[in-house]
Amino acid sequence: MNPEQFKTALAEKGIELSATQMKQFHDYFEMLVEWNEKMNLTAITDEKEVYLKHFYDSISATFYVDFTSFDSICDVGAGAGFPSIPIKICFPHLKVSIVDSLKKRMTFLDALAEKLGLTDVHFYHDRAETFGQNKAHREKYDLVTARAVARMSVLAELCIPLVKKGGSFLVMKAAQAEQELQIAEKAIKLFGGKVVDHFSFLLPVEESERNIYVINKTKETPNKYPRKPGTPNKLPIE
């Protein structure tokens, strides 16, 4: 998917990118490749692959969930900024917070935000477990996203505490995670969440499967969650 095909594909979904936004994506790609030589940000560096598997894939969440209705989003473990930075470029009104435990990624994201001229973006170098216990962030976000390989039960403990009551947690998975979801149901309920939607689709060109799960926050998360750093991964609630 080259930049023009990317622009056309988004237009077909109702997202019309301006010349400025296209330039932001171009600069994002160039910075990603340049910085990737110094630090391991991504295994994907071919232009067509980046536009498809990073940019388009990140934005695909907005085809199924109305992002114009959100004000604040938090991206947990965003790495090189996916999915939240491509979404922010398309929906500039969003206030975006990214939390990641690797300092070098924060350095990249700071430089990226400056280069792209992004406002209302904040980067936090922290463990998700600690961040979720921070009163300045706990239950403060309209939407929390995770595009991660961690199991659903682990992601639920790291992310649901950050969602405000009435807000949503959006999980982006490659393969369908029905079995994973069944195992995680106990944890999701315990943390105050309820699964309300599941969207399954094929990424264009390569036709690989993608899945989006929407979990609404119906009640507050008990104070003891998330547990200490490392515990959710070692001893997931299942």
Swiss-Prot record:
Subcellular location, principal: cytoplasm
UniProt KW Ion transport keyword: no
UniProtKB keywords: Cytoplasm, Methyltransferase, rRNA processing, S-adenosyl-L-methionine, Transferase
Broad EC category: transferase
Localization terms from the record: Cytoplasm
Listed InterPro entries: rRNA_ssu_MeTfrase_G, SAM-dependent_MTases_sf
SUPFAM superfamilies, sorted: S-adenosyl-L-methionine-dependent methyltransferases
UniProt superkingdom: Bacteria
Single GO term (MF): rRNA (guanine-N7-)-methyltransferase activity
A cellular component annotation (GO) from this entry: cytosol
Entry binding sites for S-adenosyl-L-methionine: G77, F82, A128, E129, R147
Its EC number(s): 2.1.1.-
Its job: Specifically methylates the N7 position of guanine in position 535 of 16S rRNA.
Membership in a protein family: Belongs to the methyltransferase superfamily. RNA methyltransferase RsmG family.
NCBIfam families with a match to the protein in the record: rsmG_gidB
Protein name: Ribosomal RNA small subunit methyltransferase G
Protein source organism: Listeria welshimeri serovar 6b (strain ATCC 35897 / DSM 20650 / CCUG 15529 / CIP 8149 / NCTC 11857 / SLCC 5334 / V8)
